[in-house]
Every structure is written in C-alpha cells, then in structure tokens.
C-alpha cells in the first residue's frame, strides 16, 4: 500500500487485544480522528446474522465506514485465503480513496497472517489427487507430505483428512500458476492490555449485556434459518453454549458460568498468541484498556 510507504504519518493502524477490552470503540475513534475506515480482523464477524454473539457492536460505528463484516452467510466456507483476498481488495480500495486503514480484531491467525505477511495459495480440493492417494496408508501419506513440505505441522500427520489436505496445499504451492495472496503493510500496532481480574469482570458484564440484547434469540434465529446443532457448536463460545442451553443440556445459570469461563480462557489464549507474535518480530505498543487508551493512542500516532 502506498500510504504505508509514501506518508509515514498515515501508516495503517492495527488495534488488537483480547476479547472485551474495547478494540472496536478505540478503532472507531481513531478512524474518526484520522479520516480512516475500520477493517475487521475477526474470523466470526464476517458472517451475517451473527451480530450479538460475535460482538460486532455496530451501534458503535455511527457513520464510520467499516469493512469485512457481514460478507458471508453463516455455514458457508470461508478460509484464511478468502479472508486475505478480501483484505487485500479492501486495502487497495482504501488506498485509492486515500483513507487510512484502522484494522481491528482479536483473531490471532488473521492478525498474524496480516502482520507477518503469510503467503497463501488457492488450494481447492483435488478429487483426482485424492483418487490416486486413496489406497495409501497413513505412513505412506506422511512420507509424501514430508517430501513435499519438510517443515509441515506435526498435526497434519495425525489424521488422514488433515494429511490429504496438507498434501493438496503443498502441491498447489509448488504450482507457479496457483493464485496467491500476501498482505504487505507497515502498520503501527496498538495492543490493549487488561489485567486478569478486570478482564474477567469485563467478560461477565458484556455477556450479561449480550443476553439482555437477545443473544439467545439470535441463536434461535440461526437455527431457524437452517444451521445444525453441529454447525452452531463449530462456531464456538456463545453459539456453542447457547445451543447446549436450547437443547436443554445446560440450565441458564450453568450456561452463563461455563460460557463466561470459556470466554476468559479464550481471551488468555489470544494474549498468548499476541506475545508469540512479539517474539517473532511484531512490534506491539501496549496500552492499558482502562487508562485513557484513546488519548494514549493519539499521542503515540502523532509522534
């Protein structure tokens, strides 16, 4: 993006942090301050009809434009490759209109792919390849994967379907004609920090608010639109536990307690991912979520 290189004072901004720490509110305020637009880096906010459970907080945007929210129907396939392609198109559009991107989210994989420039290739399922490999046992599949991609993930060798998928991707990477995508930006990265006790309280408060706003009704609506219990479970967190409640496998109090605990554990995993990104070279400027984050972010960006 030219704005990342030609004008250092207009570098893209990334706002990251664990769930419930105020990322959306800060991103919107920064977009208003710097004639920018917000771009979501949340793996669930891409889905339509999942507003409350994913914390889209659309009321916080007002007239501030936002992107990569409500772009896919629930249950439709949407890969990291698809997301990065949509991100690149959005960044190109903002660059053409001289709008500053304010990327905000908590999905570690999406953020890592953006900030560390993952190069991904399009790798559709290959029926012919799978037909050739259908009689290979796991050991033989593992050997083939190792020959194609010596640095593969160990989890790719523990399940036949994962191994086949990894082999398909490896062959696609070797094909120079395979469509590829790689984000290349030089952003200022702001992280919102919240101590554990305060984070627990924020999560609990937000969960109670979401239930009051109609979280259970939202899950009922998704179910009525055709999503299976399995699909709701795969959406995780709010959708998983509310689905269990609707199936009478949990009472309301147990659902609340288990869901709050699950969200907190998820938030801790997010923090671990961000710290690992730092160890791998991503510079994150951490601000306290409860200590005037907007003022401190503005001071940082106006240096």
From Swiss-Prot:
The alphabetical list of record keywords is: ATP-binding, Magnesium, Nucleotide-binding, Transferase, tRNA processing
Q: Where does the record place the region Interaction with substrate tRNA? A: 42-45
Annotated binding of ATP, by residue: 17-24
Entry cofactors: Mg(2+)
Short name of one Pfam family: IPPT
Cite the GO molecular-function annotations of the record.
ATP binding; tRNA dimethylallyltransferase activity
Q: Where does substrate bind?
A: 19-24
Q: Which domain of life is it from?
A: Bacteria
Q: Where is this site: Interaction with substrate tRNA?
A: 107
Entries under Gene3D superfamilies matching the protein: P-loop containing nucleotide triphosphate hydrolases (3.40.50.300)
Subunit structure comment from the entry: Monomer.
Name of the protein in its database record: tRNA dimethylallyltransferase 1
